[in-house]
Amino acid sequence: MTTYGVIGAAQARPVTLVVCRGCCCGNPRKHPGSDHAWQLDRLYAAAADSGGQFTVRTTDCLGPCDQANVIVVQPSGEGRRRGGRATWIGWAMGDAATDDIVRWAADGGPGIAEPPPTLELQFIRPPGEVRKRARGRGRARR
């Protein structure tokens, strides 16, 4: 008998918040007025209280350091099937931004729930997309 495993977007997986804690994000020297430890604690606590609706993980530098703190909201498996894609959020500091991110993730995240309008103002392009757009400018190759 042959068995098949489910892989990729077909898997049941929760929304994932990827929190940059590289060279600039989470660095109190760069943003001394922000409580970076509190933000991470708040995200972890909210994920624990979400009943598995979303998870949090940290990573090294994601790239757009001039827009720190950066959080990437990755869609759940169902959100991905419905067309949701990873959403990059810049300048994600303070209570209001953190609460908006938690609320959106708890509501289902990309592909499932609409983001809070104030959070949409903080959406940024992923570094790879910015590089692709920059390469498209200038003289055409022959």
What residue spans do the PLM features occupy?
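Polybasic, low-complexity association/targeting segments
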Residues: 1-26, 140-142
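Immediate flanking context of iron-sulfur cluster ligation sites
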Residues: 7-19, 41-64
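Compact Cys/His-rich
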Residues: 26-42
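Short flanking/linker segments adjacent to small metal-binding domains or redox-active Cys/His motifs
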Residues: 67-142
